[in-house]
């Protein structure tokens, strides 16, 4: 089994680095992979430009292609996908597109109600985001483009894999109700009986709860979920 991580936004490069925590997955036979998808800048500025605004769907297509490659090349069997914030948008959009590819998924503080958030100019962080996603208030094409991939707006009556969604009550970047709305809609429409968890940390912001050991606790919780979904606990 494999844990596939992705982000693909704001031109941020996901540079591989050593992680002590991931050893707990690798020691249990899991593979860890990072997808360098468009929207990031791992392959230069054009790689970023080809994954934003009207080309945003390239980000999700690349992530699906990465998962298919891992399976076709026999590197992976079952796959768990993970992303947070704008990477949570990636997870939500990917699950709407190709839920059958994945055993489970983790979406941390996910930006999943994209259209409603970007339409609300009263939110302090919304106007700066128009450069990345488009301005649906002034541009009809931006409105239709965002609506076509926004995870909340595209939940379907179909089977979804086992899913863990997290949120922080005091998160100033991605409001906690985005995750709650998305989970509620998934519970209403999904046709499977797979577990769907919403974990809202009542003392956390966008980066989790402050404190020396709290991040370790959160990673342990997530890894326990992932391992359990692959029957590795």
Regions from the language model: what does each represent?
Residues 1-9:
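Short beta-strand element of the alpha/beta-hydrolase
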Residues 2, 31, 104:
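Short, Asp-centered acidic motifs that coordinate Mg2+ and/or phosphate
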Residues 3, 18, 147-151:
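Amphipathic coiled-coil/heptad-repeat helices and related helical stalk/stem segments
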Residues 11-17, 42:
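Glycine/threonine-rich flexible loop motifs
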């Amino acid at each position: 089994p494999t844990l596939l991580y992705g982000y693909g936004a704001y031109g941020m490069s996901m540079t591989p680095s050593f992680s002590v925590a991931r050893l707990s997955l690798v020691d249990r036979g899991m593979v860890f992979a990072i997808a360098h998808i468009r929207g990031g800048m791992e392959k230069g500025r054009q790689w970023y430009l080809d994954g934003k605004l009207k080309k945003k769907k390239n980000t999700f297509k690349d992530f699906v292609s990465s998962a298919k490659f891992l399976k076709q090349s026999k590197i992976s069997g079952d796959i768990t996908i993970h992303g947070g914030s704008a990477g949570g948008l990636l997870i939500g959009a990917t699950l709407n597109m190709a839920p059958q590819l994945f055993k489970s998924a983790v979406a941390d503080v996910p930006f999943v109600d994209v259209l409603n958030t970007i339409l609300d100019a009263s939110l302090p962080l919304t106007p700066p985001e128009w450069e990345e996603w488009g301005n649906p208030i002034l541009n009809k094409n931006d409105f239709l483009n965002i609506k076509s991939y926004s995870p909340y707006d595209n939940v379907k009556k179909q089977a979804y894999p086992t899913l863990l969604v997290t949120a922080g009550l005091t998160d100033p970047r991605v409001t906690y109700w985005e995750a709650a709305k998305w989970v509620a809609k998934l519970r209403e429409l999904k046709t499977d009986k797979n577990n769907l968890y919403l974990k809202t940390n009542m003392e956390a912001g966008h980066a989790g709860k402050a404190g020396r050991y709290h991040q370790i606790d959160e990673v342990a919780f997530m890894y326990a979920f992932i391992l359990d979904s692959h029957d590795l606990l």
